[in-house]
C-alpha cells in the first residue's frame, strides 16, 4: 500500500531532481516473484512494478536515486511512530485491548466489530511494512535498490542496511513490537484527553 507507493515516489522525485526521465511501470514478474516468496515468508509480498529511470547519471546519482526509496520508508516509519501513537491515544484505541505482539488482533468480539483493533493494526502495519520494505529493497541483488547503493558506496550501503536490519531483527526476536512502541505514546496521550 502506502509504503510501496511512497517508496516509488521517493525514487521518482530524486531521479527528476537529477534530470532523469522517471515513471512507474507495471511488472507482472514482480507479482510472480511476490507470490513465490510468500511461501517462504508466510505472507503475500508483491511489487506490482517499479519506477523506471532513464538518463545519463553518475554512479553517485544512481546511488542517490536508489537509496531514496528505502530512506523514504525510514522516514515514514519514524514519522509513523509519533503520528500513529497520537492517533491511537486520542481515539483511546488501546483501552481494553490485549497486546497482540507482531501480528494482529480479533476484529469481532461477541458479534460486534472492534474498530479499535483495526485502527491499532493499521498503525502496526504502517510501521512493520515500512521497515520490511526498506530492508527487502536493500538486498544487494537483481533489480533491488541495494545493488545500486552498494555499487555507489559500500559504507552508505551497509549503514542503511543496518538501519533496517537491526530493528527488523529485534522486532522478530521480540525485543520490541510495533504495538508496544505505539502504546508507549498512546497511553499518555489517552490519559491527557480523558
Where are the language model's segments positioned?
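Hydrophobic transmembrane alpha-helices and their immediate loop junctions
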Residues: 1-194
Amino acid at each position: 500500500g502506502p509504503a510501496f507507493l511512497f517508496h516509488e515516489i521517493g525514487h521518482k522525485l530524486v531521479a527528476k531532481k537529477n534530470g532523469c526521465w522517471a515513471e512507474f511501470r507495471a511488472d507482472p514478474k514482480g507479482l510472480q516473484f511476490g507470490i513465490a516468496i510468500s511461501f517462504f515468508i508466510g505472507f503475500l509480498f508483491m511489487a506490482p512494478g517499479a519506477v523506471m529511470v532513464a538518463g545519463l547519471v553518475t554512479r553517485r546519482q544512481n546511488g542517490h536515486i536508489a537509496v531514496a526509496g528505502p530512506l523514504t520508508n525510514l522516514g515514514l516509519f519514524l514519522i509513523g511512530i509519533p503520528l500513529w501513537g497520537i492517533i491511537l491515544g486520542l481515539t483511546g484505541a488501546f483501552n481494553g485491548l490485549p497486546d497482540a505482539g507482531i501480528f494482529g488482533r480479533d476484529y469481532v468480539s461477541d458479534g460486534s466489530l472492534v474498530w479499535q483493533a483495526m485502527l491499532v493494526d493499521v498503525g502496526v502495519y504502517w510501521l512493520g511494512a515500512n521497515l520490511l520494505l526498506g530492508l527487502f529493497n536493500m538486498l544487494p541483488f537483481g533489480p533491488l535498490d541495494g545493488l545500486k547503493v552498494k555499487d555507489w558506496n559500500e559504507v552508505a550501503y551497509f549503514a542503511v542496511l543496518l538501519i533496517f536490519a537491526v530493528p527488523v531483527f529485534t522486532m522478530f526476536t521480540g525485543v520490541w513490537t510495533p504495538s508496544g512502541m505505539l502504546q508507549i505514546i498512546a497511553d499518555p496521550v489517552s490519559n491527557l484527553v480523558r
